[in-house]
């Protein structure tokens, strides 16, 4: 990558060192705690499926039953597989049904029974991880067969009506019109559900519920489109909220390609407890690493509440922290869709030059990451002509700065849920800019010591200063004080805290052992 900003390599190294210092205590916290969703994800990998007549998933019934008898601190794998042996059952879903009926008691076995339970749990979870491995190999095979999109950035488009059977033809039409990645945005508030709904769904609110069956249906439909178009069309969903680990496991089992995955989004904008979501994030990222899924992080959201000029450095800080957390969980650089956005008020003088400085800074700090570039939303007024022009400038900045994933902006943002015709016009805009200026990046070199370079240096310096302060006080304190997105979220508050447990001395999680490389 050509260095265009002349960043100080010592300062860049210092920024990464400070991010690691700020992030390390959070990783230790995540390594010493578990959550109901982590344990449910383990059981999903072990093969538990389905829901009771009220729609409550059997994994929820089983984890709740174990927690009521022995707590969560030992992990659920050993108590569950011990009970399976005592009840002389082979099907974990059947055990969940008996547990829900109150006819099974759980205990923490010792000695030979504990060894046997660990062996059984590991065998079952390893089979689930092998399924994830097969789906990853399948993706790699299909990418070789159909090919990747010929251009970068990939064109990423949101489709979601609430009805998966309506989403499918819309997604296929979007792929034909040029979309490379389809995101099925979730029904409003799903991130606050502490369970994953079951089955195909036909109604949602400003989005479509994320379920394993919906994942399967859409992936199959986009495979058809990939065959038809001669390029592999990627599918995106959301591993955020209270069920991050389960969403990651289901995405791996159903061969999704990208997942939104950032605990900061849940903390700031869904008031989810910080400890809960950092524990969940680490496990979900380990699953994503194994599944070959590209994560997308949510820094763009800060700029919807905070000012995009004044708080630009908080985006850089968050990107550096996300890189540290992702690497620690096993994700490679090519899997880091670090987020940022074109959200500066267009009335600010030189706003386009500022956007170029910020976008180029992200590109140069993370040269091997496929950055996720998000369109203007906050300053879309309902004037669709102005909106289309703004989106054109956004697309141009994406091309000039080598972004990896470009979310298509809608000129009707803040007016209506997009019509098919709105998407078509938006895609025409992207196709024109990438077709006319896709190679302009090689000619675009900011003036040495000029406005763009100076702004990028200033943002990096501010990011380092903020990381120094965060390191002195702790990341959880900084989040509690409203450092990011001007939202104050203390570590002892928020949704989902009651689903967190500290590890006991004999805690056992076969999925983590396998994902961290102690065999498969």
Q: Which residues make up each language-model segment?
A:
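Conserved, well-structured core segments that form the ligand-binding/active-site neighborhood
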Residues: 204-332
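Glycine-rich phosphate-binding active-site loops on the catalytic face of alpha/beta enzymes
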Residues: 180-191, 254-271, 322-323, 394-417
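Long, compositionally biased, glycine/small-hydrophobic-enriched stretches that function as flexible linkers
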Residues: 1-167, 173-178, 186-214, 241-247, ...
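Hydrophobic faces of well-ordered beta-strands that scaffold small-molecule active sites
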Residues: 153-161, 181-185, 231-239, 258-263, ...
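Flexible, glycine/charged-enriched surface loops at secondary-structure junctions
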Residues: 225-232, 330-335, 368-372, 439-454
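Short amphipathic alpha-helices and their capping/turn segments at secondary-structure boundaries
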Residues: 167-180, 248-249, 280-287, 395-396
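Hydrophobic alpha-helical bundle architecture
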Residues: 358-422, 440-448
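Alpha-helix-loop-beta-strand connector modules within alpha/beta enzyme cores
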Residues: 137, 141-148, 196-234, 278-295, ...
